[in-house]
Structure formats: C-alpha cells, structure tokens
From Swiss-Prot:
Binding positions (ATP): G8, Q9, S10, G11, A12, G13, K14, S15
Transmembrane intervals: none
Family: Belongs to the RapZ-like family.
Organism: Vibrio cholerae serotype O1 (strain ATCC 39315 / El Tor Inaba N16961)
Protein name: Nucleotide-binding protein VC_2532
Amino acid sequence: MRLIVVSGQSGAGKSVALRVLEDLGYYCVDNLPVSLLTAFIQSVQGSQQNVAVSIDIRNLPKEPSLVQDVLDQLKQNNDVSMLFLDASKETLLKRYSETRRIHPLSLSQSKPSLAQAIELEKQLLGPLKEQADLLLDSSNQSLHELSETVRMRIEGRERKDLVMVFQSFGFKYGLPTDADYVFDVRFLPNPHWEPDLRPLTGLDAPIKSFLEGHSEVMELKQQIQKFFEYWLPMLEKNNRSYLTIAIGCTGGKHRSVYLTQQLGEYFAQLGHQVQLRHTSLEKQQS
C-alpha cells in the first residue's frame, strides 16, 4: 500500500492536492491527527488501496519529531512519502484577502494578524518541510496549474524510472523554488530585439532558426546534454523519482523555451521519462 502525507501552509493548496489524489484513485482523509495515523493505516491495510492523508497546523503534535517517528514506523511496511505545499507570503496574503477566510492561527489566544499568523505557521512547519519528499511551490499558480503540477509529479513518482522535468521560466517572474538545477541563459542572443521575431515564441520555427544560427546557443545545448548524460546514472541510483531542470531567460518566451523544448525532446528520444513545462509562456498565453 502506498501512503502520501500531504502537508503545507494554510492556503498553499492542500485541498487541491487531495482532490487530485482522489481523482487518481487514492482514498483521502483530510486533517487526520498524527496520533491516529498508525491506527488508521492499520484499519485500511487489507484493502490494498493507496491512501492520502493531510496534516496541517491544527493537528500537529507539539513535538515535531513525533511526526517523523510515526512516518518512520509506517515506512517499515508501506511505501510512504510526504508532499509539502508552500507559497510565498505575498501569495498567501492575496489568497486570504480574496477568499476572506480566517487563518487557523488567527484564532489562537494571542490573536496574531494575518501576516504574523503566516510567519508563525512557516516557522512551526519548518521541520515538516525539511522531511518532505516532494516540495511544490504554488505561488502565482492558478487552481488548474496547481492541479496539473500535482498530477504530473504524483504520476511521475508512481513510475519506477526517474522522471526528468524540463521547465522554462522568465526571471522577471521569479525563480522556480522546486528546481534541482537552474540554468541562466540570459547571456545568449535575444530574439526579442528583432521586431519580426518578438511576437513569436521559442516553439516557433523562425525563433529556432535564429537561435540555431548562433554557435554559442548550440554549444550550451550540447554542454547541458553532456552534463546530464554523464551524471544521470548517479542521480537515478540516488533513489530519486524526478529531476527538475529549470532554464530561464528574461521573459521566459524565447531562449529558455527553445532550449527547454530541445533538451526535453533530446532526452525523450534517448528513452527517458520526460515532462515539459513552459511556466512563464503559459502565464502569458492564459
């Protein structure tokens, strides 16, 4: 039986993650106290159905190490992993403002402000975040985008082969926090300064022709390919389920999109499990 423990900051998307897991066939339980987790797993052990349980700030034990003790015990007979959802303070403030919901810690005796409650929760969940097998940052993601990200990562972990996630992004939108490797390609020739090319993206043939006409672009692509070809066997031996490679340019529209697509297709042709995401491009087109 497989158990996924879902945790994270209030407002970061735990309920979204649980809905996705339910769609994937998991038996889901929301806000189960840690003290009841072992007994609950024992009660469903015979069903052979995968299970997902959410744990949040309201049902955490006072001693954070108790969570790890329970998970370590369950790992002896089950496939256990933890999914932790995070988001920036600005994103959480905006979400609470839009939904007008009350933060769980705002109901405590000290009655902290929303900003103070978010900071306090971040500190309290710190030890849990460090134990996470899968960390997702939902900042600036829509419900649909977050659902697709969760689905992609969970389905990737269910496969035994390492999944290579190639992700393009724009630095002006911020760094992706869940990347294992980040390549800054802003030094490459920029199609943005060509009026005829500016409206296009790195997926369009004229952009490909422009970039492939510069030797430094092709050299960088080959060096990245060689780097991962050499080290991928070691990464696979390290019991990883996925590897996220983020490639960024200024706006995430031309150079990073081209390289991300090319690298993803290259490793897919070699027989690797590959997932492609053009995060900034998706934002611009939505």
